[in-house]
Amino acid sequence: MISVDGLTVEFGGTTLFSDISFQINEKDRIALMGKNGAGKSTLLKILAGVRQPTRGKVTAPKDCVVAYLPQHLMTEDGRTVFEEASQAFAHLREMEAEIERMNGELATRTDYESDSYMELIEKVAAMSEKFYAIDMTHFEEDVEKALLGLGFQREDFDRPTSDFSGGWRMRIELAKLLLQNPDVLLLDEPTNHLDIESIQWLEDFLISSAKAVVVISHDRKFVDNITTRTIEVTMGRIYDYKVNYSQYLVLRKERREQQMKQYEEQQKMIQETKDFIERFKGTYSKTLQVQSRVKMLEKLELIEVDEEDTSALRLKFPPSPRSGSYPVIMEGVGKSYGDHVVFRNANLTIERGDKVAFVGKNGEGKSTLVKCIMNEIDHEGTLTLGHNVQIGYFAQNQASLLDENLTVFQTIDDVAKGEIRNKIRDLLGAFMFGGPEESMKKVKVLSGGERTRLAMIKLLLEPVNLLILDEPTNHLDMKTKDILKQALLDFDGTLIVVSHDRDFLDGLVTKVYEFGNQRVKEHLCGIYEFLETKKMESLRELERKGGKA
């Protein structure tokens, strides 16, 4: 369906990838994998036609519809949420208008035998066949389903898009793309602004309804669930695996071991050849052999080994000062903004050493309750922090508190103590600040995502006994998430984490607080047991509704 031939991208004297080729077929479910900076997003932009390669080409049939969701979106205001999502069908209205226009032209023309008249008839017939094959009778229902599935409430439908944050606007754009039912769907980090329920809905939709999908995502569970093919971008090349992400990791390890074996054998041969040349270069009887070996080395294609992931670092928190037995106790806590009730009558007891998750749809009060704990906003009820509680707090706006005049290295060097001081560069590399140039950048030139990662590292090095993390994984790759998760498992204090990343929460938390319908409900289980319970509750709810009907 889409053919990529000899694609090369160069800029600033650097080759991002060279002479890569692959095919995207109908119903393919492809995950693009590789380190940050390997060129995944660039490749997606080229497939979408919004960027041109240095060399090579991307070809597709004329009627192939490609839809692209970038990481960062420029949105326009002026419509309601429902109207904007309905723009997914604008091309069909344009098609209908074009059919009417061409039929009108046919009605007025009299050159029935001309080639152009016959061509117009054929064009009308082809477009009409395509148009009437599409069921337009349920489009409003489809828009409603997509918006509800992605977390909107019915009362949101008539609100202007300008009322919503960038994350919610991204959901509107995602709904539009899904409703278009394109031949190829290109998604760059689609789960970044979604909650767990919306991610699950998106998974179900992509599996059951989408055609070909190419996705970049750091959400391991999402990628595993929806993809059956993995294309890795590494060192300017691609490797194509006909398996999902988890199986790809196994095959990649085997391939790298094979590469390393071949590399070592080649290096041994090269050294032996160089030794021969050095030993006999002045010996007349060996002149031809020496010259032959010199030419062989000049023509030899060196075996390269894929980049080793150097971020296999074990991060350890400083020892936690001992807190009281109950770091957080809430009785009847609630929060309202005017007539809008976020949640009411929340009763929580978090014990020392607990690792708990706050989950639920966006806007149900997870971050609001965190702000109550941090005493950033007032609230109803009683909220008590235990004896000697020392809080480490990470939120998306923590990055704005960094000293902009310090370098990345200085920012961490100022807080690092003990043996970790000898591993600052390893630590920075693990959080995607690899190399001297990256570590010597001033904070003021960093992107938002880079600042967020730096704020995270800084927090992890401070001695605290209650760690509160609000969406800590949004700007982390899979390896960095693994390092953070292991560090949190080893953390001997108390943890509250707000996250939509199921794989990250799995095995980390043993208690889940669910936010929804103005309530906070406690579940004494891990994330997957909680999700299974929710699934059963949803099925029972459907059965009850079915019984009433």
Each model region followed by its residue ranges:
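ABC ATP-binding cassette signature C-motif
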Residues: 1-261, 312, 316-549
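ABC ATPase nucleotide-binding domains
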Residues: 259-281, 286-295, 311, 532-549
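ABC transporter TMD-NBD coupling linker
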Residues: 293-311, 355
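Hydrophobic stripe of amphipathic alpha-helices that form coiled-coil interfaces
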Residues: 102, 109, 134, 141, ...
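Short, flexible active-site-proximal loops enriched in glycine and acidic residues
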Residues: 155, 268, 305-308
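Short amphipathic coiled-coil heptad-repeat segments
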Residues: 144-150, 275-279, 295-300
